[in-house]
């Protein structure tokens, strides 16, 4: 069996054009990563492709959880986090299936946590300018100013607050009360980062280039951005009123670019 301390969680819904390619790209890396696919009942046969790869080639490093219906990005990741913790992984990654996140950046996020000692590594589009390729300008501006808005309202100094390309050390996910995470859509990304920050975990932004999907259909919608926009007010209120758990060794929250 290929042993690994790291697992990449990939939520999917109708990703048949991308899923085999992204799995093979991750498994081609020198560093050994495992993959957990969380599929929300894709009618296009995404799960069937994963099962074929598990049976024919990757039984010891590729896994899948199939859910019934579209239950939300946040709940997909929380399901994956719990599975990863139960299976004793030390480094737990979030990544999209559509190549908007470059698999070649996974070792860089891993190094930030494993070698440099950070608790959370964020693949950041905005820490060194705007590094987005092939997105419509309206969407670039919406994403960029959404992150600016989160920073302004919460006082949270991460540049890319809505980024979905991350590495967590397991102790972060063991400490955050996953059952209390409120947001199911893309507001989930800001909530997880902000909660880790308030608890006192060390966070590093690693600059990456985000590339718009080459195949398949985007799952973004106005409702997703609405949740993220209005949810920020709740995050700020939580920052004032909520008692966050503290890690024993926590000092001042640290964010490094």
Task: Identify the residue ranges that each predicted region occupies.
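Short, acidic, metal-binding catalytic loop of nucleotide-sugar glycosyltransferases
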Residues: 24-33
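Hydrophobic helical membrane-anchoring modules
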Residues: 1-3, 155, 179-257
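N-proximal low-complexity "stem/linker" segments adjacent to membrane-targeting elements
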Residues: 1-25
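Acceptor/aglycone-binding surface of glycosyltransferases and processive sugar-polymer synthases
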Residues: 67-86, 91, 103-186, 213-230
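Cell-envelope/extracellular polymer assembly enzymes that use nucleotide-activated donors
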Residues: 5-7, 34, 191
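Acidic helix N-cap motif at the loop->helix transition within catalytic regions
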Residues: 17-21, 44-53
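Short beta-strand/loop segment that forms part of the nucleotide-sugar
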Residues: 10, 32-42, 65-66, 95
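A conserved acidic beta->alpha catalytic loop
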Residues: 39-48, 99
């Amino acid at each position: 069996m290929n042993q690994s301390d790291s697992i990449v969680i990939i939520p999917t819904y109708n990703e048949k054009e991308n899923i085999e390619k992204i799995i093979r790209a991750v498994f081609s890396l020198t560093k050994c990563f495992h993959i957990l696919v969380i599929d929300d009942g894709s009618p296009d046969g995404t799960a069937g492709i994963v099962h074929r790869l598990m049976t024919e080639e990757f039984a010891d490093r590729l896994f899948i959880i199939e859910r019934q219906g579209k239950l939300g990005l946040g709940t997909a990741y929380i399901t994956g986090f719990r599975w990863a913790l139960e299976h004793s992984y030390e480094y737990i990654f979030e990544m999209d299936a559509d190549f908007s996140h470059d698999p070649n950046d996974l070792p860089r996020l891993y190094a930030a946590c494993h070698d440099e000692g950070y608790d959370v590594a964020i693949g950041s589009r905005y820490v060194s300018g705007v590094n987005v390729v092939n997105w419509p300008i309206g969407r670039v501006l919406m994403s960029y100013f959404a992150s600016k808005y989160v920073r302004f309202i919460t006082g949270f100094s991460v540049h890319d607050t809505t980024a979905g390309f991350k590495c967590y050390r397991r102790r972060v996910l063991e400490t955050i009360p996953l059952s209390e995470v409120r947001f199911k859509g893309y507001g989930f990304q800001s909530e997880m980062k902000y909660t880790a920050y308030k608890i006192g975990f060390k966070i590093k932004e690693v600059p990456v280039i985000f590339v718009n999907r080459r195949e398949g259909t985007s799952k973004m919608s106005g409702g997703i951005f609405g949740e993220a926009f209005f949810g920020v007010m709740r995050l700020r209120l939580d920052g004032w009123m909520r008692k966050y758990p503290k890690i024993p060794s926590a000092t001042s929250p640290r964010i490094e670019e």
